[in-house]
């Protein structure tokens, strides 16, 4: 295979391949489309399509697909071959510019949330030239957006690209005011840290709950979990190391910058982190990464679990969304600068983020809301459901000094005025790493830690980009008309700090006292998905997202509907799986063991009625009680699921699930898990937590 540099990005139609396979004129025209959004001429599209097809066929591809990200949360693709009939009865390999730019998949079976009727099947895919095409297996995959016949976004890429453009538009206004004439565009970059579990495939196949839902619905706590803290950063087991090596190779071939890998806190839990890339590309790459992780695992006799909470009692999995803003000239706008103006510029962008997170904390919470993530958030392993920002003591001290017009200690008692004084330099390390914060500043970026491990990162970045764009718009509107730029700038930053300091919290987010303090500050707290999703339609949210043309009101309403539907369907599948497992596996197992014990007692009594059999009799009594409880709790859960059919709408159904079904699922699990602890191992019908968590050797 050669060195990594020999095969890195070998399956990607990237800039190097374009230069080598396109004429200079076609290449320059395509670059203009990629860099500036210029319209692509039909002749150029045909030339690009022909070169792309020749390159792909040369790598063994026989088909192409418009690869898109519908609102299911996973990717979608329909494969068409390159073959066309030739006059002599043979075939030619053909691919036109029209086929490259636009596709027409059937949209009827994808979630639309009422944006179209089922009979209105036509949907369109449109090529995203900013994200390179790639080869997967024998198929050329062309990243695309996906919309309805009427033009409404039916995917996650379209609003993400819109949000990036909205932020670029407003950030450019600010940068012009600071005299940055050489900057042509501003982009957000993301590096998502992907957590996951690896378990033996042969054990996975014996667990209906893992197969149907991606998480264990039953399972008693094993003698050992993560108490010893010996797995985090521990020596990677040979089988896992082999998996990681193959995974890296597959990712590198696709140009995915896989960088860091290590064991995570829970047994069998691991993490993969890439180098940062532009947000839409990072989103595409993360979707690919999750798919490839699961495929490579199968080759190693493993299963990769991406659910946020596959096992109770140990940490779940998240996906830290490391987000930054930079210019095309290479300036990170979240890094303090060397000159007074650079520091004022940094503080303005910092304040824009602070204001955005405070004003739209509900949208950030909504962006990570799923049934799976509800198990993780606020569970002393992940940030709470309350959104707050961590800045660190030194940056906090600087903001306090600006707010109060008081000297900052580290600045030698010198009162700072923005645009006049240089912000004191501080090492990135002084910002610490508060793992309990949902949204932490870590030196030159923000780390949004609420995203779930199976989630697309698109949603979180759509809301974050749009909210920051709104803050920057407000700032630009005020500064562009200011008579005294420096005075207005200082006043505006000072006002932002005063008005939005409630969102800043540098303490322990796991502490219950913080939830009480957050309530006093007036911060929103939405513990579950049904609590937060309806707030997407709050007036301020509709106004902001529509004003920046990120989502229309109809698109927002559809997403509200789809998110609630997904929540309901997910939990109902879990509940029905529990009912099935309880009746067909757990109850027969407990009854079988009880019968064996009863037979043993009868055999002993047949020898002598004086034999006490106290242990067996006590255990039989306990198992009999548990059997009745499991049966009763199963019936109660089934009844609560059946009651959902009477719900007036999806919101009412979601509330009923939150208020009744979830609790009855927990009650059934509690008695079933207790039964596991007193049932002989040979009778228990599926692998235990101990086997699953410590099965990869």
PLM regions: where:
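Active-site core of metal-dependent hydrolases
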Residues: 7-120
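Hydrophobic/aromatic-rich, well-ordered segments within soluble, folded domains that form packed cores
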Residues: 61, 65-69, 285-299, 325, ...
């Amino acid at each position: 295979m050669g060195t990594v540099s020999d095969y890195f990005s070998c399956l990607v139609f990237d800039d190097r391949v374009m230069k080598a396979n396109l004429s200079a004129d076609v290449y320059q025209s395509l670059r203009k489309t990629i860099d500036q959004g210029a319209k692509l001429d039909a002749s150029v599209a045909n030339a690009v399509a022909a070169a792309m097809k020749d390159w792909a066929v040369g790598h063994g591809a026989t088909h192409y697909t418009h690869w898109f990200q519908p609102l299911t949360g996973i990717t979608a693709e329909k494969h068409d071959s390159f073959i066309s009939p030739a006059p002599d009865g043979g075939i030619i390999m053909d691919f036109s510019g029209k086929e490259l730019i636009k596709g027409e998949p059937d949209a009827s079976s994808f979630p639309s949330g009422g944006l179209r009727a089922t009979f209105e099947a036509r949907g369109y895919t449109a090529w995203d030239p900013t994200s390179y095409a790639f080869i997967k297996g024998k198929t050329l995959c062309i990243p695309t957006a996906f919309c309805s016949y009427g033009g409404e976004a039916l995917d996650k890429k379209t609003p993400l690209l819109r949000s990036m453009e909205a932020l670029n538009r407003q950030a450019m206004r600010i940068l012009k005011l600071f005299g940055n004439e050489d900057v042509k565009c501003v982009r957000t970059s993301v590096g998502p840290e992907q957590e996951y579990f690896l378990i033996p495939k042969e054990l996975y196949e014996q667990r209906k709950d893992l197969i149907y839902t991606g998480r264990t619905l039953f399972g008693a706590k094993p003698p050992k979990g993560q108490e010893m803290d010996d797995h985090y950063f521990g020596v990677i087991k040979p089988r896992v190391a082999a998996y990681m090596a193959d995974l890296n190779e597959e990712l590198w071939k696709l140009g995915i910058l896989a960088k860091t890998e290590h064991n995570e806190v829970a047994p069998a839990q691991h993490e993969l982190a890439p180098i940062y890339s532009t947000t839409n590309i990072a989103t595409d790459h993360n979707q690919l990464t999750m798919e490839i992780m699961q495929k490579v695992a199968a080759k190693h006799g493993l299963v990769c679990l991406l659910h946020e909470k596959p096992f109770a009692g140990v940490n779940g999995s998240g996906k830290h969304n490391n987000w930054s803003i930079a210019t095309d000239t290479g300036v990170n706008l979240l890094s303090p600068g060397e000159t007074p103006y650079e520091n004022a510029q940094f503080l303005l962008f910092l304040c824009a983020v602070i204001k955005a997170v405070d004003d739209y904390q509900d949208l950030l919470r909504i962006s990570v809301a799923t049934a799976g993530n509800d198990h993780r958030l606020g569970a002393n392993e992940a940030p709470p459901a309350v959104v707050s920002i961590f800045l660190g003591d030194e940056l906090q001290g600087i903001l306090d000094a600006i707010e109060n017009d008081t000297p900052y200690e580290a600045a030698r008692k010198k009162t700072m005025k923005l645009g006049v004084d240089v912000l004191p330099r501080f090492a990135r390390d002084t910002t610490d790493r508060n793992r309990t914060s949902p949204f932490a500043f870590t030196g030159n970026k923000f780390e949004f830690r609420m995203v779930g491990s199976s989630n697309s990162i698109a949603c979180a970045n759509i809301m974050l980009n749009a909210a920051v764009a709104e803050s920057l718009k407000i700032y630009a509107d005020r500064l562009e008309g200011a008579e005294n730029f420096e005075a207005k700038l200082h006043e505006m930053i000072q006002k932002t700090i005063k008005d939005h300091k409630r969102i800043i919290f540098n303490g322990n987010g796991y502490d219950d006292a913080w939830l009480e303090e957050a309530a006093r500050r007036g911060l929103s707290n939405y513990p579950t998905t049904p609590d937060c999703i309806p707030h997407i339609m709050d007036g301020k949210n509709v106004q902001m997202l529509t004003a920046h043309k990120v989502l229309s009101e109809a698109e927002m309403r559809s997403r509200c509907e789809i998110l609630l539907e997904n929540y309901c369907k997910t939990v109902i599948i879990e509940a029905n799986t529990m009912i099935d497992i309880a009746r067909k596996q757990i109850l027969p197992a407990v009854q079988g063991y009880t019968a064996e014990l009863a037979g043993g007692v009868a055999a002993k009594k047949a020898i002598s009625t004086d034999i006490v059999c106290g242990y067996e009799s006590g255990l039989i009594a306990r198992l009999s009680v548990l059997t009745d409880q499991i049966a009763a709790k199963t019936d109660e859960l089934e009844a609560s699921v059946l009651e959902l059919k009477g719900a007036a709408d999806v919101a009412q159904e979601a509330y009923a699930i939150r208020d009744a079904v979830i609790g009855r699922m927990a009650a059934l699990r509690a008695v079933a898990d207790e039964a596991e602890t007193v049932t002989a191992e040979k009778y228990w019908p599926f692998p235990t937590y101990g086997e699953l968590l410590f099965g990869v050797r």
